[in-house]
């Protein structure tokens, strides 16, 4: 049908009311909180307990986030808190005795651990409030029951503690071990309060599980038979090496000119600067690859905001972790309790000072007896009798000998 000329064609559109329009909503929900294995895709991260108690004291963490520590003490119980952290105290103020305690200043000053603490005691029960000046910190309380010892990895993490048999000893890295520089070993029975940057969380490792953590985020961990070991992730960055005589051929190492140069003061000063530059680069440029590996069973307290790596690891520890091959960790040390092995004294004795018998014994593999034992076996066992003569002298007479 042809449209009529001069007549305008009308077009219409159907408008749907708002109530009948189709709308899609996006719902965002929190993931279900399960407790999967730590070696799986998820990590069982739990919050630290807000209160712990013993027979003589109770620690309660209050605030959101945790910013205050409430300490309830029984009569004649001592509380040690870091100097300048006491906020308030309730109870009979006339009975409270507060003294400034200097705890092992020489040992703690060497490792950078605070040694000025305030000792609070009272013959009547009191309640004290403890806090820190930093606004981005939170508290965690731990009940040390004597069955498991703790290692506080951060220098300023230990805030307060109470307990008559609680022993806190600063540790020093003397043999390039993985123990943190400036850590404190906590043994005995009592309550301790730890402070960290940001939020504090607890990681529970079961037997056979492993966890890799950055040393600046580790606040404390339980001391097990397997101490934490160095771990370094693989990377394609260029390794910084310090040139030395060992990289030269053996013929050049024995040359007189090379020996004279290596003994000069200028060469030694240059090598010292090279080593400092390598240590600085490992702690700043490649510092994000330095980690610690923990083996279960173990409990680890981690903080969400870690300090600088320089505040946690010493230069020797950074070099030790950096020297570990990428992605490789040494096997955990085995327990040697009950296994006593005697070291052969001939191993440390110079060859020119050994006798003919000692040289013969040292050349025999698998021989466990010493030279004195072999000579005694050859000579046999003799029995002698001491007789007192009339003139007052002692005469020793051999009675029998058995080979």
UniProtKB/Swiss-Prot annotation:
Per UniProt, the ranges with Basic and acidic residues bias are: 336-359
Q: What InterPro entries does this protein map onto?
A: AIM24 (IPR002838), AIM24_sf (IPR036983), Trp_RNA-bd_attenuator-like_dom (IPR016031)
List S-S links within the chain. Answer: none
Under the cellular component aspect of Gene Ontology, which terms does the record hold?
mitochondrial inner membrane
Q: Which UniProt keywords apply?
A: Mitochondrion, Transit peptide
Tell where it localizes. Answer: Mitochondrion
Q: Which Gene Ontology BP annotations are present?
A: inner mitochondrial membrane organization
Please list the residues that make up the transit peptide in this record: 1-30
KW Cell wall biogenesis/degradation (keyword) present: no
Q: Where is this region: Disordered?
A: 320-364
* Primary localization: mitochondrion
Question: Record's family?
Answer: Belongs to the AIM24 family.
Report the protein name in the record: Altered inheritance of mitochondria protein 24, mitochondrial
| UniProt organism field | Penicillium rubens (strain ATCC 28089 / DSM 1075 / NRRL 1951 / Wisconsin 54-1255)
